Amino acid sequence: MSIPETQKAIIFYESNGKLEHKDIPVPKPKPNELLINVKYSGVCHTDLHAWHGDWPLPTKLPLVGGHEGAGVVVGMGENVKGWKIGDYAGIKWLNGSCMACEYCELGNESNCPHADLSGYTHDGSFQEYATADAVQAAHIPQGTDLAEVAPILCAGITVYKALKSANLRAGHWAAISGAAGGLGSLAVQYAKAMGYRVLGIDGGPGKEELFTSLGGEVFIDFTKEKDIVSAVVKATNGGAHGIINVSVSEAAIEASTRYCRANGTVVLVGLPAGAKCSSDVFNHVVKSISIVGSYVGNRADTREALDFFARGLVKSPIKVVGLSSLPEIYEKMEKGQIAGRYVVDTSK
């Protein structure tokens, strides 16, 4: 298979710098890496943070962002096992980990102190060819629609793991804060497929229609409802058993601690820059609620999340545009104008 020397990519050279669509060299895989011809990449809110550089963790610069890349293996290092040329492969947020520390030993690779992050510390999937650690790269079944599966590689895995972290049972209420966004639209479907009753909170044109089309049961529009807490408690007859906070609103996170049912779980997923999670201690203790953080997922979570997709239980509500349109997508994202998930075609 012929591999070119150069490729098209979106790259920036400083935080908040110009997003340049230009030719850059095709990377060479290290002994433990795959070289993947990225066909499509999802666009995540994390990519926006990587560009802004507003998280405590510094990015590499210059940087090619993106961490939801779906494509075809076209090359590999000499130490790679379990892959062959032509396999479908996915690039995840966790590009690689040491596999030797206590966290990796327990399957918590995302907490590895030496984790390498796609589109953050490792050039990501907003390019035609990208490298990924062969151990952490996702195995995608042949014949899968690579555009539709792309968002599963971060958004899908992330919300699936978060729902597992909520310790819910069939028939329990799962509240999704930010239910019509890229992560939320997938969380609604995973929750439904796992047997939960789903309440969604979001606001803006088309959000309720999308939520309902995905199988959600109760929708609360925060732009119209004056008392979100009371509305959730009433709709769920006592509060949600589990809340998945994919919204990037500090106020929404605080509210979720108040509409959580007694003995319920608040799961923090979205990462608004500089935000804090505030919970009234008396209410927290007397209601015996748990607040947990959930950060992407491990290889088993990846396999399980992809299986839901492969069986048709979860679909990606996507809009495909060219990679060159990435600056416009970021602008829409900053204005909260995105329903579902944008996916970029790296060839355009």
From Swiss-Prot:
Q: Which reaction does it catalyse?
A: a primary alcohol + NAD(+) = an aldehyde + NADH + H(+); a secondary alcohol + NAD(+) = a ketone + NADH + H(+); ethanol + NAD(+) = acetaldehyde + NADH + H(+); butan-1-ol + NAD(+) = butanal + NADH + H(+)
- Which metal ions or organic cofactors does this protein require, according to UniProt? Zn(2+)
Q: Which gene encodes it?
A: ADH2
Name by which UniProt lists this protein: Alcohol dehydrogenase 2
Gene Ontology BP terms: amino acid catabolic process to alcohol via Ehrlich pathway; ethanol metabolic process
**For binding Zn(2+) 2, which residues are annotated in this chain's numbering?**
98, 101, 104, 112
- Name any one GO molecular function: ethanol dehydrogenase (NAD+) activity
Q: Which GO terms describe its cellular component?
A: cytoplasm
Main location, first listed in the record:
cytoplasm
Q: What else is known?
A: Present with 1620 molecules/cell in log phase SD medium.
User: Cross-link Glycyl lysine isopeptide (Lys-Gly) (interchain with G-Cter in ubiquitin): which residues?
Assistant: 226, 234, 287, 319
Cite the Gene3D superfamilies for this sequence: Medium-chain alcohol dehydrogenases, catalytic domain (3.90.180.10), NAD(P)-binding Rossmann-like Domain (3.40.50.720)
The superkingdom of the source organism is: Eukaryota
Triggers of expression:
Repressed by glucose and expressed during anaerobic fermentation.
* InterPro entries per UniProt: ADH-like_C (IPR013149), ADH-like_N (IPR013154), ADH_Zn_CS (IPR002328), GroES-like_sf (IPR011032), NAD(P)-bd_dom_sf (IPR036291), PKS_ER (IPR020843)
Note describing how the cofactor binds: Binds 2 Zn(2+) ions per subunit.
Quote the EC number.
1.1.1.1
Q: Which residues carry this modification: Phosphothreonine?
A: 223
- For the modification N-acetylserine, the affected residues are 2
Its quaternary structure? Homotetramer.
Alphabetically list the UniProt keywords: Acetylation, Cytoplasm, Isopeptide bond, Metal-binding, NAD, Oxidoreductase, Phosphoprotein, Ubl conjugation, Zinc
Binding positions (NAD(+)): 45-46, 49, 181-183, 202, 207, 222, 269, 294, 296, 341
Q: What class of enzyme is it?
A: oxidoreductase
Q: Which residues bind Zn(2+) 1?
A: 44, 67-68, 154
User: What protein family is recorded?
Assistant: Belongs to the zinc-containing alcohol dehydrogenase family.
